[in-house]
From Swiss-Prot:
Highest taxon above the source species: Eukaryota
Residues engaged in binding Zn(2+): C214, C282, C289, C292
Gene: rpoC2
Catalytic activity: RNA(n) + a ribonucleoside 5'-triphosphate = RNA(n+1) + diphosphate
A GO molecular-function descriptor: DNA-directed RNA polymerase activity
Cellular compartments annotated: Plastid, Chloroplast
Protein name: DNA-directed RNA polymerase subunit beta''
Keyword Chloroplast among record annotations: yes
Root EC class: transferase
Gene3D superfamilies the record matches: 1.10.132.30, 1.10.150.390, 1.10.1790.20, RNA polymerase Rpb1, domain 3 (1.10.274.100)
Pfam families linked to this entry: RNA_pol_Rpb1_4, RNA_pol_Rpb1_5
Biological function: DNA-dependent RNA polymerase catalyzes the transcription of DNA into RNA using the four ribonucleoside triphosphates as substrates.
EC number(s) per entry: 2.7.7.6
Length: 1330
C-alpha cells in the first residue's frame, strides 16, 4: 500500500478508493472510508469553518489587469473609428482581451489565497473540490466577465465587478439575461436528460448477461497510447480476443481480462495494437455474454451472470446529460482555434525570408500578416549567431522580412493538421448617423437579389456615410430648392398641392423601379431629311430609352425594337447555330426586363446566321403538391395524360421530374425514342443539331431540324431522344440611319453627320433554359439603335429634344438630336470675362381656391440642400447640410469653427388665391465652367461642380413695390474658389464681386492663375480621423473635403467610415439616403463550432437518434486511407462486396461510439465505452430485406434482426438478401420483439392494432413487459432463469469435456489401427515382390 503525503483533493480520493477496492475489496474499503469520514468531521468541528463576506478577498492585481484591458479596448475602438478594422475584428479583439484578462485573474486567485490566507474558507472549500468550482469563486472574488445576449452573441461590454464588490445598474441589467438563462437551461437540460435516459433504457432494457462465452471469432482493434492514462484506462477490464506475443513469447492468452499491469507491459514493449472483445461483436441475439462485456465497474472483476447491464448502460449515458452545456463559441476567423503552435525567436536579431513565397492577408484581429504557400526557410541573424528554421506550409507570418525581432517574440503561427469545425455567421452593421452612402471599392449587383438594392463587395474597402439631416416627410411633390441651394431657417422647403389641374404630356413618367432610370416613349418614327422632304425609313414601333437630362454619349443605346417574330410563348432551351456572338459584357450589354423584373445580360450578334429553340413543357409544383403527381420520372407519356388532377399534358414526350429548392419542376420533352444497335458508334451524335434532309443513324431522313439527346437511365437502359428544334434566322441590314446637324448650330465649321447604327442582341446564352410563366411571352432578340458620330469630332455628348409639329390640325411628335459643344475656358485668351445670361420667363396660372390646397414644409435649421446622387430615388428625397454636419479647418491654425455660408441667393415665390402667381425661374443659356465649390454628384467629381451662389431666389412673397436689384445687392457675396485641371492640381483663381447693373446680365471677371500649386488636398478627398499631413494639424474628425478657400482653409463634410471585407453585403445603393439605425452592411465571417452547430446534450441526442449531421464524411481523407488497405484485398472477389459492406458497418459502429465519447469528454464527463457500445449494438441490430421472399415469409423493406437473418440464411436453400441499417433509439424501441414494450413507449394505439392484425406473440423476454404484467423480472443473480442457465452451462461444459476425451481416445485408436494396417500392407507387398 502506498503512503500518501499530499493534499487529498477529489482526484486523489478517487484514486485512493480505487486502489483500496482492488487490494482489499469493498467490505474493508468501506471500513477505511468510514474512518476517513470520522476524521474529517472531527477536524471540521475543531476548525469551525464558516463563510462570511470578509472571507472573499479580491486579488490585488485586478486593478492593473482591468486597466490594461481597457487600454487595449481603447486602441481597438480607435482603429475601428479610423476604419482600420471592421466590427467583427473589433469584437474578436475585445472578447479575447477580456477573456484572457478573466482567465489570468482566475489563475491569480489560488496563489493569492496561499500567500495571504492559506486557511481561508473559500480557498479550502473550492480548491479542495468539496464545494464550489473555480469559476464560481472567480465570480465572487474576481470578475463576472463576458455575458451573452438573447441571440446568443457575446456582449462586448464585460462585467468588471464581482459579487463581493457589487454590480452597477448597467452590469446588473447585462447579467440578468445570462443568469436567468442559466436557471432555465438547467431545468431544460434536466428534463431533456430524463427523457434521453428513458429512451436509452427503453432500447436496452432486455439486455442481461446470460452466457459466459458466445464463441464469437470477431474482434476490435485498439492501440495503447504512451503516457495517456485516461485513454488507456478504458482498456482495463476488457477481455482479449486473441493471444498476445512479444518476441515469440506469449504474455497473454485469449479470453484473459486486461489488468493495469498488462497495460503497462504493453506500453513498455511498445505494442502497436491488440484485439479485444466488445458488446458490438457478441453473437447472442437477445442477451450478452460475460466475456464480451468484461469487468463490472462496481466490483472490479468479471461481471456476474444475471446482471441487467442494459439498464446500467442507459442510465450511465443519460445521467451525465445534466452536466453537458448548450454553449457556442463566438470567436473565429483566420486560423482561430486551428493554431497548433507558435514559433518564437531564440534571440534578438534580424529575420530574413523569401518575400515571393508569401502573400498578404489579415489576421483575425485585422492586423497585417502573410501566408506561406510552401515550407518557408527563415534565417535569424545577429552579430554573433545565426539560426535557421523552417516554417510549415499555410502558416501565418506575423513579421516582415529584414525586420528586427526580439527574443521569444512570436513570429509565426502554425496551422493545425486537422481543421476545426466552423460555421458561417452574419453580423449586421448599423449606421451611427443619418446621411448619404458612398463607396469607392468595386461593388457588384448581387445576382440573388436582382430587383433590390443588395450589392456584394468584391474586395475589402470602406463604406462612407456622409452626414446630413434627413427629413422623414418625403411626400411633397414639389421642392422649391435645387441641389446646392442655400437655405434659411423657417423658410418653406417643399410644397404639396392637392386637387389641382395639371398639363398632361404625351409621354410616360419615369420608371422608378428601373435600375437605369429613363424616360420611355412610344409610337415615334425616325425620319431622314433628303431633298427637303421627309421620308419614312423605319416603320416599326420603337421604344425610346433616354436619360432624364436628355444627354447621350457616343455609342449609347437610345431606342429598342422587339421584333414579334422573335417572341416566344413556350419554354425551352436555346441552342446557337452558326451565329457569331460577343460574350464579353460591355456598357450596353445589361438591360432590365420589365415583365420579369430582372436584370439580364445581352450579347451582341457579330455575324448573321441562325439559332434554335428546343421546346419544352414545364410545370412547377410546390412541395405540398408532390403527392398529387400522377406521372413517373423518366417515363414517356402521350398528349392528354393527366400530370396532376388539374393539369394535363399538351404534348407527347419524355417526363423529367427534378426538385428545385422547395418546389418540384416537371418537364415534358417532346420527341420520339430510338434505341440504337451500336451504342458506342452512335454516342458521338449526342447533342448535335441535324438539318432537314440529312440521314439519321444511316436509316432515316429528317424532315425538319431535330436535336439528338442521349439519355441514360441505367447501365442497360439508354436511348436517343429525337427532339424537334425551331429555327430562327438573323439577317443584318447594313444601312445606318444618318441625320444631318441643323446648319444654325455650327455655321463656321464643316458639317458633321450623326449616324444611327442598328445592332442586334440575343438575350440568352447557348444551352440556357428559358422558363415562361403561363399567359406570358419572352423576347429572344432585340434590335437596338446606337447613336454615333465621327471620331474626329471632339464632342462627347449629344442632346435629344422633343418637338410637337402641327400639320393639318394633327399634332405629331418628333425628336431632334444636337451635338453639344463644351465650353473651354483656356481657349478664350482675348476676353477674360465669361458672361452668364439668365432669362426670366413669366408664367400665368389661374387657380381656383376651392380646388387647391397647399401644404408647406418649413425648415428647422439653415444649411444647404443636398440632392442624393442616386438616380433611382425620387426627387422628393433630400438632405440639408447644416453647420452641425460641416466644419471648417484652417490649415495654419488648429482651431475649428462652424462653416458660415455667405452665398445666399434666394428664389422668389408668391401665392395669392384667385390672383396671378408670379414665379421667377432662373435658367442658364449655356453651361458654365465647373467650379471647385460644394460637391454635387459624386460619381464624376470633376464634372459636377456648380456655382451654387447664382441659382435661385429665396421663397418669399413679392410686394408691389419690390425691387429685384436691391435684393440682389444685399444678398449676393462672391467668394474665392479654385479650379481643377486634368492633373487634379489645385490652382487658385480670384472671383470678385461685380455691381449688378442689368437684370439680365451678370459678369464675373477672372484674373490670372496663382503661382502656388499643391497636391496635398484634393476636392472630394476622404480622410479618416487622426490623419496628419506634413506641417498641417491633425484632422480631428473623419470626413470629405467639399470646398477649399484661398485662405488655406478647408470645408469638411463630416463622414463615418465603415470597413467591410470582400463578400460583404451592402444593403443600399450608391448615393442613397440612410437614416440613423438603418442596416448598412452584412459581414460574413466564420465562427468556431464544437463539431457541429448543435452541441452538448442536443448533439448526443442527434447522434443517438441517427439524424443526418453532415452530407459528407468529416474524416473522409483519413477514412479512405485506412479502408483502402482492406478494400484492395476484396476487389475482384465475389465476396468482396459483402465483406466491404460488413467492414463499413463495423467502422460506422466504432465511429459512432467515438463521436458520442467526444461530446462527453469535451465537457469533462467520463463514460465507459462498453455502455455506449451496448446502445450502438441495438441501433445496428436490424437489417432491411431487399426482395420479396415467398419462401421465407418476409416482405421487402421489413426490419428483421441481423442474427435472425444470418441464421435463416444458413438454414434455407434460398438466401435472404438484406442490407444493414442504422436506427435511432426511438425507432429501435418501436421495432422490438415485444409489442407490449413498444406500446408502453409510444404510439400505443397503432402498435397494439398492428400487433393484433399480424397476430404477434410476446414471449416476455425483457424486463419491462414482465413489470407491466406483474411477473418476476428475468434478471438478478438469483433469478430462476439465470440459475437454470448456469446449470445448463455447467452440464454443457461437462458434456463437452467428455466428448473431447472420447474424440481424443478414438483418434488415438484410429492412429494405431492405421499404423497396423499400413505395416501389414507393406509386408504383403514386399512378400509378393520377392
Amino acid at each position: 500500500m502506498l503512503f500518501y503525503n499530499k493534499v487529498m483533493d477529489r482526484t486523489a480520493i478517487k484514486q485512493l478508493i480505487s486502489r483500496l477496492i482492488t487490494h482489499f475489496g469493498i467490505t474493508y474499503t468501506t471500513y477505511i472510508l468510514d474512518q476517513l469520514k470520522t476524521v474529517g468531521f472531527k477536524q471540521a468541528t475543531q476548525a469551525a469553518i464558516s463563510l462570511g463576506i470578509d472571507d472573499l478577498l479580491t486579488a490585488p492585481s485586478k486593478s492593473w489587469l482591468i486597466q490594461d484591458a481597457e487600454q487595449q479596448g481603447y486602441i481597438s475602438e480607435k482603429h475601428y473609428r479610423y476604419g482600420n478594422v471592421h466590427a467583427v475584428e473589433k469584437l474578436r479583439q475585445l472578447i479575447e482581451t477580456w477573456y484572457a484578462t478573466s482567465e489570468y485573474l482566475k489563475q491569480e486567485m489560488n496563489p493569492n489565497f496561499r500567500m495571504t490566507d492559506p486557511l481561508n474558507p473559500v480557498h479550502m472549500m473550492s480548491f479542495s473540490g468539496a464545494r464550489g468550482s473555480t469559476s464560481q469563486v472567480h465570480q465572487l472574488v474576481g470578475m463576472r466577465g463576458l455575458m451573452s445576449d438573447p441571440q446568443g452573441q457575446i456582449i462586448d461590454l464585460p462585467i468588471q465587478s464581482n459579487f463581493r464588490e457589487g454590480l452597477s445598474l448597467t452590469e446588473y441589467i447585462i447579467s440578468c439575461y445570462g443568469a436567468r438563462k442559466g436557471v432555465v437551461d438547467t431545468a431544460v437540460r434536466t428534463s431533456d436528460a430524463g427523457y434521453l435516459t428513458r429512451r436509452l433504457v427503453e432500447v436496452v432494457q432486455h439486455i442481461v448477461v446470460r452466457k459466459v462465452d458466445c464463441g464469437t471469432s470477431e474482434n476490435i482493434f485498439v492501440t495503447p497510447l504512451q503516457n495517456n492514462y485516461k485513454k488507456n484506462n478504458k482498456l482495463i477490464g476488457r477481455i482479449l480476443a486473441d493471444n498476445i506475443y512479444i518476441n515469440g513469447r506469449c504474455i497473454a492468452i485469449r479470453n484473459q481480462d486486461i489488468t493495469t499491469n498488462l497495460v503497462i507491459s504493453l506500453i513498455n514493449f511498445q505494442r502497436k495494437g491488440i484485439f479485444i472483445r466488445s458488446p458490438l461483436i457478441c453473437k447472442s441475439m437477445l442477451w450478452i455474454c460475460q466475456l464480451c462485456y468484461g469487468w463490472s465497474l462496481t466490483h472490479g472483476n468479471l461481471i456476474e451472470l444475471g446482471e441487467a447491464v442494459g439498464i446500467i448502460a442507459g442510465q450511465s449515458i443519460g445521467e451525465p446529460g445534466t452536466q453537458l452545456t448548450l454553449r457556442t463559441f463566438h470567436t473565429g476567423g483566420v486560423f482561430t482555434g486551428d493554431i497548433a503552435e507558435h514559433i518564437r525567436t531564440p534571440f534578438n536579431g534580424i529575420i530574413q525570408f523569401d518575400t515571393n513565397s508569401v502573400y498578404p492577408t489579415r489576421t483575425r484581429h485585422g492586423h497585417p500578416a502573410w501566408i506561406c504557400n510552401n515550407n518557408l526557410s527563415v534565417v535569424i541573424k545577429s552579430k554573433k549567431k545565426l539560426h535557421n528554421l523552417v516554417i510549415p506550409t499555410q502558416s501565418l507570418l506575423l513579421v516582415q522580412s529584414n525586420q528586427y525581432v526580439e527574443s521569444k517574440q512570436v513570429i509565426a503561427e502554425v496551422r493545425a493538421k486537422t481543421s476545426p469545425f466552423k460555421e458561417k455567421v452574419q453580423k449586421y452593421i448599423y449606421s451611427n448617423l443619418s446621411g448619404e452612402m458612398h463607396w469607392s471599392s468595386k461593388v457588384q449587383h448581387s445576382s440573388e437579389y436582382i430587383h433590390s438594392n443588395v450589392h456584394l463587395l468584391r474586395k475589402t474597402g470602406h463604406i462612407w456615410i456622409l452626414a446630413g439631416n434627413f427629413d422623414k416627410d418625403n411626400k411633397f411633390s414639389f421642392i422649391f430648392y435645387q441641389n446646392q441651394d442655400k437655405l434659411d431657417n423657417k423658410l418653406p422647403i417643399a410644397k404639396q398641392t392637392l386637387n389641382y389641374f395639371q398639363l398632361k404630356e404625351h409621354f410616360l413618367n419615369n420608371f422608378w423601379n428601373s435600375i437605369y432610370s429613363s424616360i420611355i416613349l412610344y409610337n415615334y418614327r425616325f425620319l431622314e431629311k433628303k431633298n427637303n422632304k421627309y421620308e419614312k425609313k423605319l416603320l416599326f414601333q420603337f421604344m425610346l430609352k433616354l436619360p432624364k437630362n436628355g444627354i447621350l454619349k457616343q455609342n449609347d443605346i437610345f431606342a429598342i425594337f422587339n421584333d414579334p417574330k422573335y417572341r416566344i410563348k413556350n419554354s425551352g432551351i436555346i441552342k446557337y447555330g452558326n451565329i457569331k456572338v460577343d460574350l464579353i459584357n460591355k456598357k450596353n450589354d445589361i438591360f432590365e426586363d420589365q415583365k420579369t423584373k430582372t436584370v439580364r445580360p445581352r450579347y451582341k450578334i457579330l455575324k448573321e446566321g441562325n439559332f434554335f429553340l428546343l421546346p419544352e413543357e414545364v410545370y412547377i409544383l410546390d412541395q405540398s403538391s408532390f403527392s398529387s403527381i400522377l406521372v413517373k420520372n423518366n417515363s414517356f407519356i402521350k398528349a392528354g395524360t393527366k400530370i396532376t388532377f388539374n393539369i394535363s399534358s399538351k404534348i407527347t414526350g419524355f417526363v423529367k421530374i427534378k426538385k428545385k429548392f422547395n418546389n418540384f419542376k416537371i418537364k415534358i420533352l417532346p420527341g420520339s425514342i430510338y434505341y440504337p444497335k451500336e451504342k458506342q458508334k452512335n454516342f458521338k451524335q449526342n447533342g448535335i443539331l441535324i438539318p432537314p434532309g440529312e440521314k439519321i443513324f444511316e436509316q432515316f431522313r429528317a424532315k425538319n431540324w431535330i436535336y439528338l439527346e442521349w439519355i441514360v437511365l441505367s447501365k442497360d437502359n439508354s436511348f436517343f431522344l429525337i427532339r424537334p428544334a425551331i429555327e430562327y434566322k438573323i439577317i443584318f441590314n447594313d444601312n445606318p440611319l444618318t441625320l444631318p446637324i441643323p446648319f444654325y448650330l455650327d455655321l463656321l465649321k464643316e458639317q458633321k453627320k450623326i449616324k444611327i447604327q442598328t445592332v442586334k442582341y440575343i438575350l440568352y446564352e447557348d444551352s440556357e433554359e428559358v422558363e415562361i410563366n403561363p399567359d406570358t411571352d419572352i423576347q429572344l432578340i432585340q434590335t437596338c439603335l446606337i447613336l454615333n458620330w465621327e471620331t474626329k469630332v471632339f464632342i462627347k455628348e449629344a442632346h435629344i429634344s422633343f418637338i410637337k409639329i402641327r400639320i393639318n390640325k394633327i399634332i405629331k411628335n418628333f425628336f431632334q438630336i444636337n451635338l453639344i459643344e463644351n465650353i473651354n475656358l483656356m481657349n478664350k485668351k482675348k476676353n477674360n470675362n465669361i458672361i452668364l445670361n439668365y432669362l426670366f420667363k413669366k408664367k400665368r396660372y389661374i387657380i381656383n381656391q376651392k380646388d387647391c390646397e397647399k401644404i408647406l414644409l418649413l425648415s428647422k435649421t439653415w444649411g444647404i440642400i443636398r440632392t442624393p446622387s442616386n438616380k433611382n430615388q425620387e426627387k422628393s428625397f433630400f438632405l440639408i447640410l447644416s453647420p452641425f454636419n460641416l466644419f471648417q479647418t484652417i490649415l495654419f491654425d488648429k482651431t475649428k469653427q462652424n462653416l458660415k455660408i455667405e452665398n445666399n441667393v434666394e428664389k422668389l415665390f408668391t401665392y395669392e388665391p384667385k390672383k396671378i402667381i408670379k414665379t421667377f425661374n432662373i435658367e442658364k443659356r449655356k453651361n458654365f465652367v465647373e467650379f471647385l465649390g460644394l460637391l454635387g454628384y459624386l460619381q464624376n467629381i470633376t464634372k459636377s461642380f456648380q456655382l451654387f451662389s447664382c441659382k435661385k431666389f429665396s421663397d418669399k412673397s413679392i410686394p408691389i413695390n419690390f425691387s429685384i436689384i436691391d435684393n440682389l445687392k444685399k444678398k449676393i457675396k462672391i467668394s474665392k474658389w479654385f479650379f481643377l485641371n486634368e492633373n487634379k492640381k489645385v490652382q487658385k483663381f480670384f472671383l470678385t464681386q461685380n455691381t449688378i447693373l442689368s437684370l439680365l446680365n451678370w459678369s464675373f471677371p477672372i484674373f490670372d492663375l496663382a503661382k502656388k500649386k499643391t497636391q496635398l488636398f484634393n476636392l472630394g478627398h476622404f480622410f479618416c480621423d487622426g490623419l496628419s499631413i506634413a506641417e498641417y494639424p491633425t484632422f480631428s474628425e473623419s470626413g470629405q473635403i467639399i470646398a477649399i478657400y484661398d485662405d488655406l482653409s478647408l470645408v469638411i463634410r463630416l463622414a463615418k467610415p465603415y470597413l467591410a471585407t470582400g463578400g460583404a453585403i451592402i444593403h443600399n445603393n450608391y448615393g442613397e439616403i440612410v437614416k440613423e439605425g438603418d442596416i448598412l452592411i452584412t459581414l460574413i465571417y466564420e465562427r468556431l463550432k464544437s463539431g457541429d452547430i448543435i452541441q452538448g446534450l442536443p448533439k448526443v441526442e442527434q447522434l443517438l437518434e441517427a439524424r443526418l449531421t453532415n452530407p459528407v464524411s468529416i474524416n473522409l481523407e483519413k477514412g479512405f486511407g485506412e479502408w483502402n488497405k482492406d478494400m484492395t484485398n476484396f476487389f475482384g472477389s465475389l465476396w468482396g462486396y459483402f465483406l466491404s459492406a460488413q467492414i463499413s458497418m463495423e467502422q460506422s459502429q466504432v465511429n459512432l461510439v467515438n463521436q458520442i465519447q467526444k461530446v462527453y469528454r469535451s465537457q469533462g464527463v467520463n463514460i465507459s465505452d462498453k455502455h455506449i457500445e451496448i446502445i450502438v449494438r441495438q441501433m445496428t441490430s436490424k437489417v432491411f430485406t431487399l426482395e420479396d421472399g415467398m419462401t421465407n415469409g418476409f416482405l421487402p423493406g421489413e426490419l428483421i434482426e441481423f442474427a435472425r437473418a444470418k441464421r435463416m440464411n444458413r438454414a434455407l436453400e434460398e438466401v435472404i438478401p438484406y442490407k444493414p441499417v442504422l436506427l435511432g433509439i426511438t425507432k429501435a424501441s418501436l421495432n422490438t420483439q415485444s409489442f407490449i414494450s413498444e406500446a408502453s413507449f409510444q404510439e400505443t394505439t397503432r402498435v397494439l392494432a398492428k400487433a393484433a392484425l399480424r397476430g404477434r406473440i410476446d414471449w416476455l423476454k425483457g424486463l419491462k413487459e414482465n413489470v407491466i404484467l406483474g411477473g418476476i423480472i428475468p434478471t438478478g443473480t438469483g433469478c430462476e432463469e439465470v440459475l437454470w442457465q448456469i446449470t445448463l452451462e455447467k452440464q454443457k461444459n461437462i458434456l463437452l469435456k467428455k466428448n473431447k476425451s472420447k474424440l481424443f481416445h478414438n483418434k488415438v485408436k484410429d492412429i494405431f489401427l492405421y499404423k497396423k494396417l499400413s505395416i501389414s500392407f507393406t509386408s504383403e507387398k514386399i512378400h509378393k515382390n520377392y
